[in-house]
Amino acid sequence: MLGGMADRPYHHGDLRAALIANAERALAERGPSALSLRELAREAGVSHAAPGRHFKDKQALLDALALTGFDRLTGRLEDALAAVGEDGARTSVLALARTYVGFAIDNAALLDLMYARKHDPRSSAQLSAAMERLLDTVVRPIVDGQSDGEIAGGDPWPVAMTVSAALHGFATLKAAAPPEKVEESLAEVVRVLFEGLAPR
């Protein structure tokens, strides 16, 4: 039976994507320590050796999953900015905040994996680039706010890092809070941030 499984073509069309999707579900349900390439292969209906064509080991799969998370989050942040349009830096940052915190609450295990220290050095460059793309999205309304006088001038990158850190910490603290409380508190956090960032 195993021989037939190994010889038949993959019915998914994209085994790599199927493995990542199954891994994300398993991560959310059981955590990273419970992930098994053999079990994921069984769920995908392929031989236990088949995942090795895409991921040399479990860590490579986890790194790919983290990269997928960064790409998805960045895409959602970009969509949030596009939906706001030219409505001011504070409105843009609040839209980013809602999107980031919503993603963090819905994908807590994935977000933990994305920012985990333990990654294969060969994946670190890709993950660093993915994190930089995310920060590029956050820095955009900061630069606009500086141009419009809402935010003090200077290097926008430390400001973007501060905003990102505040949102990440907020999401961690409020993960189990009722949605209406999260929204109320989030608006207050953004208000306080902009008071601190305003020109003196």
Residue ranges and their predicted role:
Residues A18, N22, A26-A60, A64:
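Helix-turn-helix
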Residues M1-D14:
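N-terminal intrinsically disordered/low-complexity leader segments
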Residues R8, A116, S123-S128, E132, ...:
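Hydrophobic/aromatic-rich alpha-helical bundle segments in the mid-to-C-terminal region
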Residues R16, L62, A66, F70, ...:
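Amphipathic, non-transmembrane alpha-helical scaffold segments
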Residues A64, E78-L110, V159-V163:
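Hydrophobic alpha-helical connector segments
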Residues L94, R98, L135-V139, V143, ...:
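An amphipathic alpha-helix signature
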Residues P141, V192-R200:
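C-terminal alpha-helix
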Residues L15-E24, L40, L65-G69, L73, ...:
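Generic hydrophobic, amphipathic alpha-helix propensity
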